[in-house]
Amino acid sequence: MSGHGDKDRDRKLGSQHSTLHERGFGGNGAVDAEQESSMSDNEQPTEYRTYRRRWIGLLTLTLMNVVVSWDWLTFAPVADLSATYYGVSKLAINWVSIAFFLAFVAVFPITIAILHRGPKLAFMIAAVLIIIGNWVRYAGSASSTGGRYGAIMAGEIIIGFAQPFILAAPTRYSDMWFTNRGRVAATALTSLANPLGGALGQLINPRWAKQSADISNMVLYVSIISTVCSLPAFVVPAAPPTPVGPAAETPKLSLKESLKVLTHSIELWLVLIPFFVYVGFFNSISSLLNQIMIPYGFSDDEAGIGGAILILVGLLFSAVTSPIIDRTKKFLLALKLFMPVIGICYLTFVWMPETRNVAGPYAVLAVLGAASFALVPIALEFLTELGHPLSPEVTSTTAWAGGQLLGAIFVIISGALTAGDDGNPPQNMNRALVFQAVVALLVCPLPLFLGLFGRGDKIILKRVRSDTRGVPSGVRIIA
């Protein structure tokens, strides 16, 4: 390859090069290793390549994120019926969600250590916990005449232990298997599958459970779906045979070194703090939307549709924005646009239930979902870029753990701020919505400070730079 040294040195990851055409492939930049013909005996260059088998893990991670979120929101969309079936109060049903959030926080240090070794082990641990947790819940719900609250709480905690292993995995998986042309989209697909599961729960569970006796079958159906979607975790490939690009083979910092970088980086915290808050409020509003809207005369189905709009519109919008960010790398601009929009949406939503008409809440929830869902993969990938060579699971697991912790705290605070039976209307959550709006507006300006005060060098996209800088002679990149 000595004759092509200068040419190879200029090649960049993800570029569409004539080399692909010379070797009989199209110029779409998506050539898989299984399709590669062997090189001549005289040329044995190092090649970076992607593999078709990466889609197995991506699909599995997507399915597991769907079902773990559906498991979380099994009871919230039918809180009244669930409370009757298990013989507890609605507050006790809220504590099922709270326990789920806190379970994430309890095991997130272990999650970082497991993901640091690779995503496959994390997938298998999550699959085992999801399957066990679901059937423990069903064991306490097998009778149509009433269930055992302790069993569903225990099962929910077990499922909560599973969530960090897959919710924090997308950035680690995309870093290992995808080039910089596809990482944001891969992270978006797998991360946003989690709220998709919540949308399915919001839409489907109220149709499965029309009366308290139906809760048993509802739990059974969710358990079967969760089991089927978790089984592929045991056949996911552990790692690509060769690195997909220069950044993928860059030695990652140790966990101790990573913790030091994380605690001392102002830029990371300017992104992490609003991420914590907005994920926490998203979890809170998803858990409590039924209780927010019903006091104003909305039905379970109307509240469920509102939750589904929040999620589905967000998914569609993120499907548009993620490929654009993948190509342009405008992470910072996107953060500075979407975070203020989210804050304004929480402020506007304070008055929406009082309209007693679905149009207002649905419109605000749609915009809130669009901005929130677009933000998630952008923020996670931007954190990875800022922290490189931190291993991606360090920033992503920390980000999600903070969001889950605040989600639990916000649900508890919202419950305490709920009006009594003498409220107008009784049991309204207006004060909780005001609290939500104030905190959301307080944190939304933080990303606006990124790159200011002479710290422009701190927001360089380090992983992208590692991928796109000149590649040494004898290296060929096939993205």
Swiss-Prot record:
This is MFS-type transporter EF102. One of its GO terms (cellular component) is membrane. It is found in: Membrane. It holds the Pfam family MFS_1. Belongs to the major facilitator superfamily. Induction: Expression is down-regulated when the stress-activated mitogen-activated protein kinase (sakA) is deleted. Residues 36-45 have a biased composition (Polar residues). One of its GO terms (molecular function) is transmembrane transporter activity. InterPro entries: FLVCR1-2_SLC49-like (IPR049680), MFS (IPR011701), MFS_trans_sf (IPR036259). Residues 1-24 have a biased composition (Basic and acidic residues). MFS-type transporter; part of the gene cluster that mediates the biosynthesis of peramine, a pyrrolopyrazine synthesized in association with the grass host that protects the plant from insect herbivory. Probably involved in peramine transport. It comes from Epichloe festucae (strain Fl1). Keywords: Membrane, Transmembrane, Transmembrane helix, Transport.
